[in-house]
Amino acid sequence: MSPNSTLWQTILQDLEKLYNEETYNELFLPVTSTFKDQNGLLTMVVANEFLKNRINKLYIAKINELATKYSSTPVRLKFVSQEEVIEEPVADRKLTIDYRQGNLNSTYTFDSFVVGKSNMFAFRMAMKVADHPGAVANPFYIFGDVGLGKTHLMQAIGNYILDNDVEKRILYVKADNFIEDFVSLLSRNKNKTEEFNAKYKDIDVILVDDIQIMANASKTQMEFFKLFDYLYLNNKQIVITSDKPASQLTNIMPRLTTRFEAGLSVDIQIPELEHRISILKRKTATLDANLEVSEDILTFIASQFAANIREMEGALIRLISYAQTFNLEITMNVVEEALGAVLKTKKKTNDLNENNYDKIQSIVADYFQVSLPDLIGKKRHAKFTLPRHIAMYLIKLKYNIPYKTIGSLFNDRDHSTVLSACEKVERDMRMDSNLKFAVDSIVKK
């Protein structure tokens, strides 16, 4: 990773703490790493003009403050849209790939992946793909919410293949890095597509993480489409991850999404409590902390972080580090001391109090004069579906919890159903003033 990319990753860590999850995921996480460093000016790429203007207007001062804090030399950042970058000349940069390591994290293996009901099918199919790359499921498309193990499972495929065939050429690449490589090579000389294609085509297995980041990057999508077809026709294994099903991807060209759907799609769901406890036990063992963490404490931590395994493991690491630093036995009092700030922030930004969900459901039901059971239930008459969709939308808007979690509040509806409902309400509000008035009125209650 380049020094500029490292700087941005460090800034990202602070931005995640400073702003709510929705702002972080929508504005900052998809930003492509810098492609130019000129006299201390780092240029960052975002998907479109709207995101560029929003960041430059509302957040650039804080971002540059953090850049100054973490950089050893004077530096400032500016944000440009994807289309601006294509037209702006930059210095040449050779694209190099280390196939021996494939950009893989060696700790992401099948053995270290904790299997449960929520990821069993995805795990078993991943192992089949690793055993027979290019032959069983191609492309292999893994989707699910943030922090549930998609990257781990994807890289486990790569590590397994490398362990069993050192001659295999494997590449793991995040979608934003793919965009950065494309932009850097083509911004001066648009005829360099041959060099770009040659580097990426010379592989046996490609692992592309967070494909949704390519949204709106039309030129990059076209190049990826060409690469996809070449690899597929030559029986090279393609593995892709995303935060949503291929059919729900927005601003990704249909010719790509239909190809994603033509392979095998598997989802990783939110793990049940027992599964989360098992994950924590495995993590505790790998930390080799020589500290006993009781079942009750593991259960408490698991119950507080239902939707994001990465956050849950981070909380455990923080707890153990705190106990080691002050030479403490891990008790509930120590848990409160070590994780108090984390849990308080989590409650503030992502309140998981079910009664508050009930309150939104009740207010919406009263407004539309339908019963709560009908609002939550499966009746499909418009009298019930509209308020049901609005209730889903408002819960997502206020608490920003995973779509799967919202679905569990409405008779166990699935991720895609809730996502579709929320997008429909948001879309229809732009065209229907009566609907917007109704939603605004409910919000004021």
From Swiss-Prot:
Q: Could you mention a single GO BP entry for this protein?
A: DNA replication initiation
Q: Which InterPro entries match?
A: AAA+_ATPase (IPR003593), Chromosome_initiator_DnaA (IPR001957), Chromosome_initiator_DnaA-like (IPR020591), Chromosome_initiator_DnaA_CS (IPR018312), DnaA_C (IPR013159), DnaA_dom (IPR013317), DnaA_N_dom (IPR024633), DnaA_N_sf (IPR038454)
Where on the tree of life does the source sit, at the highest rank?
Bacteria
Enumerate the subcellular locations listed in this protein's record, separating them with semicolons. Cytoplasm
Supply the CDD domains for this chain: AAA (cd00009), Bac_DnaA_C (cd06571)
Q: Which Gene3D superfamilies match?
A: 1.10.1750.10, 1.10.8.60, 3.30.300.180, P-loop containing nucleotide triphosphate hydrolases
Does the record bear Cytoplasm in its keywords?
A: yes
What is any one of the record's Gene Ontology cellular component terms?
Answer: cytoplasm
Tell me where it mainly resides. cytoplasm
Q: Which of UniProt's keywords are assigned here?
A: ATP-binding, Cytoplasm, DNA replication, DNA-binding, Lipid-binding, Nucleotide-binding
Stretches for region Domain I, interacts with DnaA modulators: 1-73
Q: Where does ATP bind?
A: 147, 149-151
Any one Gene Ontology molecular-function term assigned to this protein's record: DNA replication origin binding
Q: How does it assemble?
A: Oligomerizes as a right-handed, spiral filament on DNA at oriC.
Q: Which family does it belong to?
A: Belongs to the DnaA family.
Q: What is this protein called?
A: Chromosomal replication initiator protein DnaA
Lineage of origin: Bacteria, Bacillati, Mycoplasmatota, Mollicutes, Acholeplasmatales
